[in-house]
Amino acid sequence: MASVSSKRIPGIWSGIGWALADKSAHFPSRLQLAGRALRGALWHGKALRRWMAMVFELRARGIVTDLPSEYLRALRPYVHSGTGVSIRVVQLIDHADWLETALKPAAFTQITSDAPVMLADLPPPRGYQFLRLQLQRAPAQSTEGDLLLALVLQRSPEVQQRAAPVEVATIAFSRFRIEGQGCFVIGGVRGQRHPVLRLSQVELNQVLSGWKPSVLMLRVAQELARFWGLRLIGLDPAHHPVHRWP
């Protein structure tokens, strides 16, 4: 989606046109997202104007580049069903404010440039060039969180020429306040999703020394939450809308 070049803050009604032009819209469809933008402008105008001003400021500072996609974060389906637009805006602003203080300046610049930040370079097993824990910003279309914590490995050139990095496990999460307390809110835990760049179960067990990827990543999330002074919160499966509009 093309970014907006105007030096004036766009009105929230622009969100309807942005939704209709959103090429990434599969779930929800463009019409569904545009309907959400219309209802949001009618019923949650104050919250959305606040979010529009925030995104405009972030774009002016070079922290985000695609203003329409960032604005639509507040209107897309969220993994916790029943989260209204006004609450979602508060969560997004809280997360954006926290991220700038949680990371060192160099890491913040890196992650806002959509480049992954390496948190730990782990000893790679034999036959692998590296095994890393990295943090990166989630795509604007993500329904599960605003950051991705990923375990990434790459085979050594002796084993595979021009090997590409493989994400073997990922946690999607956000940071916002619940009942006044800062929380590390997990929205999704997933394994390998790439149709080609993937490891067999046997190879994965060898690489992780028998650890299940999801269990290992949750342990890492616990340590990160402790480091940041956050409460670790998981999602109640009863509130997880997988194939429906929240």
Model-derived regions: residue spans:
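Acyl-donor binding region in acyl/amide transferases
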Residues: 167-246
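Non-catalytic substrate-recognition and accessory regions of acyl/acetyltransferase enzymes
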Residues: 2-203
